[in-house]
Amino acid sequence: MKIVSRRKILKDNLILGVKRYITINLLFLFLLILVRIYEYFYLKSAITLPANSIKLELSGIGLDILMLFNLAVWFALPCLVLFLISKHLFNLIYGFLVILFIFAEIALIQYLGTTSLLLGTDLFGYSFDEVIKIVSASGGFSFASLLLVIVFIALIVSILILSRKIKIGNLVAYLFIVVSFTSLMFQRYTKPDAGEFKSELAYNLTTNKAYHLFSSTYKFYYPEDASETSLYSYFYTGLSSVGRSFEYISSEFPFLHKDNTPDVLGKFFNIGTEKPNLVFIIVESLGRAYSGEGAYLKSFTPFLDSLELKSLYWENVLSTAGRTFEVLPSIFGSMPYGKSGFAEMGADMPDAISLISLLKERGYVSRFFYGGDANFDNMKVFLNKQHLDYLIEGKDFGLEYKKMPPIKTGGFTWGYGEKDIFKKSFEVLSNAGIQPRLDIYLTLAMHDPYCIPDQDYYNRKVEERLSANNFDEAQKIEYRKFLPNYASILYFNDALRTFFEDYQKRDDYKNTIFFITGDHRMSTPPIATQIDRFHVPLIIFSPMLKSTAKFSSVVSHLDFTPSVVAFMKNNFGMSFPTVVPWLGHGLDSMRTFRNTNSIPFIRTKNEIIDFIDRDYLIVNSQLFKVSENLRIDQITDEKKLTEIQRKFEKFKTDNLKACLNNSLIPDSLKFNTRR
């Protein structure tokens, strides 16, 4: 009798546990639908949604339902064991997990509303201190956001408590179990297929944000097992993994090759006897979407547009990353990315050569001007390893300079805006010697939260710009959702105009070459295509120019240093290493559209999923045809997809080998050896 009684008690408790587990999951589903409704109305007020956004949200609800039934199967056993141990503990822990998931979903919806992006493994590419700075600069959680979270948590707790009175029948329980196990056959559909969507925002809107973050986190810490050695053996062919063929030196140094970069710049310049000063202005978030002729959001950089007409102008330039962390290694060293970005390797960065170190050996003095903390993204570590002479950052600015305003009183600010950065640089350069210079500027204002000096003035300038473009009221409403973004662009444009007005007063102006480019596009307004985030301009301006030109050929940040070195070597009698590890082939001076390169991208730290190969782009397993103005159209061609994926995998293998084994350059090319 005792045995029968215990078995019956166990059976009854198990049935009770199953029903309680199902009840909480059904309430979880109700909350997910509630959050989807909130998401639609919140994002509709915050950003410009796709025309079919309601349909996308309904598709998202379908994916949420499938996700929930999948999770219900995987969590069932541990939850039932916990229920049998302690009903109270089960309610507490599983209730907490539901609250955590919903809280994460709300927070990530707000992140999407601010950035138009999903948060994934790029989170793990930043230190805790850097994450705090990013969140603080964006204003953190506002009171309204905090109140919303409190209301949701209170609602969830109330529902969980009241749910104890809900008794579900056997039919509901059986149906839930059958549907849950059936859902496992469709597990791969819990995340949408990116290839089915016309825009990245449409995909992001449909995706469950919390599930994306948690599943990405799991894959980050438990990646699919792949032997680096076997990959290398399989893909290594001795051919270039990055476009036009290089003459490689040795498989021990995967990227080392003879430098045959042609000088495409020299013919446009009046060459004097003095070595020119080189000034690089790297503009935070300067995308082609809102700068230059043909900008699809209309141009908000009138002065820069006028400068393009007096310059060598490349309209189809690709950055190598969707954030700032890779811009210095790419522009000044044409370097690979390692696992999470070249500079992210910190003290373990492989030995390399760069424009900074090469010019230092040839008599140049280098300076880096930045209005923030150069420790961010390991910029200072990278620049010091490249033997930069002087680094001027935010802490070096005096009391006469004023930081950009924080989003809320007493909050964090990234540092000083462009006007102050340029002003500080003239103060520093007033004491510069007669040696030729390499001056590097990295700006800050066009960065979330886009709080700038004279905000009201530039907000009015945006309104004037909207009227000048003859936008109707409906268009103006959409543009006003990103009013601070556009205001920050106009602020930069004015700062650049003042910079050149002041520079013209300097004696060395006539012997200076200016390079202006963006590090990537803003994430808001929403990115139109998969390649849009990387699309930036390049303007090379100088009083030394004897002719101007506009080029439509596709080039990248990786091409800058090879071309500058070829220019200096060919026109100023300077000798440089005959072998180099650069990924870029140099700038292409074709005036019509073409792409002769293969370019890998590191979208965010920990995300190397984009690769362009001549007229084709792959993003994960999607294949796109690339055409004029960097338009992309998704196509199906399994043979071509496989061919390009092999090239991409070879690059990724070479990339890890060179970076993890310090085999980018031999000892003979290292800075201390050559001195």
Feature map (PLM): residue ranges:
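Generic low-complexity, intrinsically disordered sequence content enriched
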Residues: D122, R164-I166, F235, G243, ...
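Transmembrane and membrane-interface helices of multi-pass
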Residues: K2-L231, T673-R675
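Extracytoplasmic/periplasmic/luminal assembly and interaction segments
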Residues: S227-F255
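Generic detector of well-ordered alpha-helical segments enriched in charged/polar residues
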Residues: I15, K19, K55, D129-I132, ...
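Intrinsic-disorder-associated interaction segments
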Residues: I3, R7, K11, I15, ...
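Solvent-exposed soluble domains appended to multi-pass membrane proteins
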Residues: E252-R675
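Alpha-helix capping and helix-coil boundary motifs
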Residues: S5, I9, A46-S53, I61, ...
